[in-house]
Structures are given as structure tokens and as C-alpha cells.
């Protein structure tokens, strides 16, 4: 089933050896950021480009994260920055990065700022104070008469976001200037990753995979979901991950059927499964790996049946994934396997059967239990841009799932004449599988001839049960080599 997938072995050591073999590749250089800006300039052709960075949070105890399009173009991660580029004949004629000025009083509270004089060395872009942006913008925009914005610019929105407000302030007195949004063009550039980006994704995913291994040892009936979250996020930080890439999901029992459950405060019970959907961010690049585990270390027969359907669906998508294959093809293949499995266990009437919604629409019955897409791109964002057709350098997830929600009959399947046969037919299976939610998610890189699996945490039923049977006395000892990855990024 998974013959086309090249992986790095089942254990931690093979993965670690591959990562350490390329220590210099795990950073995106100023030269690469310049190539990205040049590629955008080719697409814009002529005029001004204004890339808008994220603003500083209103309180200094709220973490700041740079928005992904701006980080992609500049690598600059301080707040309030803006990049102004003048493009002529598809090339950058001039560019300036406007940043917060040095301010020793503010830096006493918030930390060191690079400042305009330090920007060139760090980013390769000439720097000026953001306080000078208005004057520079006024001089150039009058000449060009139009501007291309990179950022969430949406002047028609009811509530104006920070990007729109900052652009609107610059445009005061320039009503004749036309504005286009070229964030989509930046997203297209982000869809295929460079070698440096792929190395960062491998490392982020390796840390995430290690967190899953720790969780498999830590799980036990009576523990709370937040204890699992603590193990996960401790593992992330101790190996240099700056933060979780998204809110960690640890959903047990009925919570396993909630796709993006975030409360993480239920005491897990003997006989539960728990969905652990986690991802570290390393060097700005996000992993996203999910495992579904038996809390007591052994899957029940019913849990195994649902789990195997999901695993087979993932395997089918893996099997066909290679350059030239469309995302839609993989999605259809995975969905077909899920539908066939659900029909076999009695949760739907047949593979192609439908049900009637409250609005009178006919929807495939398998969507009662599998209501999301097969996967998504990964990169600077955990849901990163990716193309409709696979090509080498694309990084993405495959994550089918089945969720047997406890409110299926009361709130999900309308009690109307058209659905009576369905409701009667699937009730016995529902009672067997209720409160079982299963999602299996892995991360991949498309190669010239197939697929590289970069998240090899145990996922076969036997592998998981074997991993959970091993004694666990707490997190593994500090791995100095892994911590050294971070030093090489400085």
C-alpha cells in the first residue's frame, strides 16, 4: 500500500542522522529572500509594491508573530515594519525596509531592536525608520499612480484590519491612486519550497514526531488531556521550537469526534481513544502530525475497525501521490476508501448513498462521518499554499478521518421521511462505534519520483500498541545534538 513512500526509518536515530547531515541548509538566507522579491517583481512588472508587516500587540506580554507573506519576502520578524519596492520592467529598481527606530527606553521593557542601521546586515535590504515611510511613499506614489499591496488589505470589510488601516493612512491625499492586492502572487511563490525550507520542515516535523513518541509513553487512564498537552509542548520547546504551530488538540472519548477541539481538560477513561493533533513551529515552519491512540494502550475491536479504515484511506492517497497527480485525485481516492469502509461496518447504507439535509439537499452519507478534505499544504503557515497538482518541492499533509459523533441522531441527521431508512439501518453500528473519532495525519515532501514521508511516528495498530507497552519514566534525556540545531540557525 505504501510502496512509493520513502521514509527515514521507524526509530529516532535514523531520522536524527539525516537531519544532522545537512547543518548549513536549515536557514533561509538573505540571498534567498532577495530571490523571492525578484520573483514577485517579475510578476508585478511595473509600479510600487508595499508589503505590510504585522503590528505590535497592544500589550508587551502578548506574543508577536510576523505574518507569513511579509516573513517570506524579508525574513524580518520585528513588528510594525513595511517594505517598499519600486519595480521597473519586471525588476526591482529600489527597495527599502522601514522598521522601528532604536529606542533604549522601550528596549528596556521589550528587548533589543535591530533598528534602521542594522537592517541591511540582517536582511540585505537598506533600512530606514518607519517614521520616514510617509514622506517616501508620497514622493513615489504620485509618480507611479498605482500600488500593489502584499497583506490582508480589504477596504470593503465592515471592520478594518491593521493592514487596511495602515495602507489607508498612507493613501490619504492620494485618492487617484489605484490599489491592487498581490498577496495571491506571493502565495503562488510559496507553494513550492526551497531546499532550505524543506530542511526546516523536516526538523519541525522531527520534533513533532518525537513529541508523539513521548505521548505514547505518557498516556494512561485517569490522566487529564492537559497533561498530554504539557508533554507535547515541553518537548517542542526543549528542542528549539519557538511555539506550537497551532493550538494543540488532545481530544479523548467524545472529544475525539470534535475536529478542532481545544479545551483539553477532560480526564481520560479506560477504553477511550484520544486524538492528538499537534505541530511545532521551527524557524517559522510548521509541522502538523496527528495520531489516534488507545488511552489504555490497546485498541478495542470496534476502535481497530474504524482505525484501519482511516489508515487504509491514508495509504491509498499515499500510493498515488507523485508529481503530476492532482490534489482532487488523492482526495477522491481517500474518500472512496472511507465510504467503502463505512458501508462495510454498517455506518452508511452504501458507498454512494445520500441523505437529506434540513435544507432539502442530498449529501453523500459518508460525509456524516468524514467532513473535511484529505489534506493541506504546510510551510510558514500550518495551512500553507499548495498547488492543485503535485510537483517536486511541495510539502503537504494527508489526514483522513472518521468521527462518530454522539449527537448524530438528535442533531445531525434530520428526522424526516427521506432519512427514516438510513436512521433505522445504521443505528446498531452507531451504538457500536459512538464516541470513536479517528484521524491519522502525516507530513510529506514531493520528490522527483514519488513521496518522502517525514513524520514516521508509529501509526500501524501493532506499532502503536508496542510503543505504548514500553515503560515510560518521563521525557527522554536531553539530546544535545538536537539542541545544537538551533545554535546553527543563529
Where are these regions (language model features)?
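Active-site neighborhoods and metal-handling regions in enzymes and metal-associated proteins
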Residues: 24-490
Amino acid at each position: 500500500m505504501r510502496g512509493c513512500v520513502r521514509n527515514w526509518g521507524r526509530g529516532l536515530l535514523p531520522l536524527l542522522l539525516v537531519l544532522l547531515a545537512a547543518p548549513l541548509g536549515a536557514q533561509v538566507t538573505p540571498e534567498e529572500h532577495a530571490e523571492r522579491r525578484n520573483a514577485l517583481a517579475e510578476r508585478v512588472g511595473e509600479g510600487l509594491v508595499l508589503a505590510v508587516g504585522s503590528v505590535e500587540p497592544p500589550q508587551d506580554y502578548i506574543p508577536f508573530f510576523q505574518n507569513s507573506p511579509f516573513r517570506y519576502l524579508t525574513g524580518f520578524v520585528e513588528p510594525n515594519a513595511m517594505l517598499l519596492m519600486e519595480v521597473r520592467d519586471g525588476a526591482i529598481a529600489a527597495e527599502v525596509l522601514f522598521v522601528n527606530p532604536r529606542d533604549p527606553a522601550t528596549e528596556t521593557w521589550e528587548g533589543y531592536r535591530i533598528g534602521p542601521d542594522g537592517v541591511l546586515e540582517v536582511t540585505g535590504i537598506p533600512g530606514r525608520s518607519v517614521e520616514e515611510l510617509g514622506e517616501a511613499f508620497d514622493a513615489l506614489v504620485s509618480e507611479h499612480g498605482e500600488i500593489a499591496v502584499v497583506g490582508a488589505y480589504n477596504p470593503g470589510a465592515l471592520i478594518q484590519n491593521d493592514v487596511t488601516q495602515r495602507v489607508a493612512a498612507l493613501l490619504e491625499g492620494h485618492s487617484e491612486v489605484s490599489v491592487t492586492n498581490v498577496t495571491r502572487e506571493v502565495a503562488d511563490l510559496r507553494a513550492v519550497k526551497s531546499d532550505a525550507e524543506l530542511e526546516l520542515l523536516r526538523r519541525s516535523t522531527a520534533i513533532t514526531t518525537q513529541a508523539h513518541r513521548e505521548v505514547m509513553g505518557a498516556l494512561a487512564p485517569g490522566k487529564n488531556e492537559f497533561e498530554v498537552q504539557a508533554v507535547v509542548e515541553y518537548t517542542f520547546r526543549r528542542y528549539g521550537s519557538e511555539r506550537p504551530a497551532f493550538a494543540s488538540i488532545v481530544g479523548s472519548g467524545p472529544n475525539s469526534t470534535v475536529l478542532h477541539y481545544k479545551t483539553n481538560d477532560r480526564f481520560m477513561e479506560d477504553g477511550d481513544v484520544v486524538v492528538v493533533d499537534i505541530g511545532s513551529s521551527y524557524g517559522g515552519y510548521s509541522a502538523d502530525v496527528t495520531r489516534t491512540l488507545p488511552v489504555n494502550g490497546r485498541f478495542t475491536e470496534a476502535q481497530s475497525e474504524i482505525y484501519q479504515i482511516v489508515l487504509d484511506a491514508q495509504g491509498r492517497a499515499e500510493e498515488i501521490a507523485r508529481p503530476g497527480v492532482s490534489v482532487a485525485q488523492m482526495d477522491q481516492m481517500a474518500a472512496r476508501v472511507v465510504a467503502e469502509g463505512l458501508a462495510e461496518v454498517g455506518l452508511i447504507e452504501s458507498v454512494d448513498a445520500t441523505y437529506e439535509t434540513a435544507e432539502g439537499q442530498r449529501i453523500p452519507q459518508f460525509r456524516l462521518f468524514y467532513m473535511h478534505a484529505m489534506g493541506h499544504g504546510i510551510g510558514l503557515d500550518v495551512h500553507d499554499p499548495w498547488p492543485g497538482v503535485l510537483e517536486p518541492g511541495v510539502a503537504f499533509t494527508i489526514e483522513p478521518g472518521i468521527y462518530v459523533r454522539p449527537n448524530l441522531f438528535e442533531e445531525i441527521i434530520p428526522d424526516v421521511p427521506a432519512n427514516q431508512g438510513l436512521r433505522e439501518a445504521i443505528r446498531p453500528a452507531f451504538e457500536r462505534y459512538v464516541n470513536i473519532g479517528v484521524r491519522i495525519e502525516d507530513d510529506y515532501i514531493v520528490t522527483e519520483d514519488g513521496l518522502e514521508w517525514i513524520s514516521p511516528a508509529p501509526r500501524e495498530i501493532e506499532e502503536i500498541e508496542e510503543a505504548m507497552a514500553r515503560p515510560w519514566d518521563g521525557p527522554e534525556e536531553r539530546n544535545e545534538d538536537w539542541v545544537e540545531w538551533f545554535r546553527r540557525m543563529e
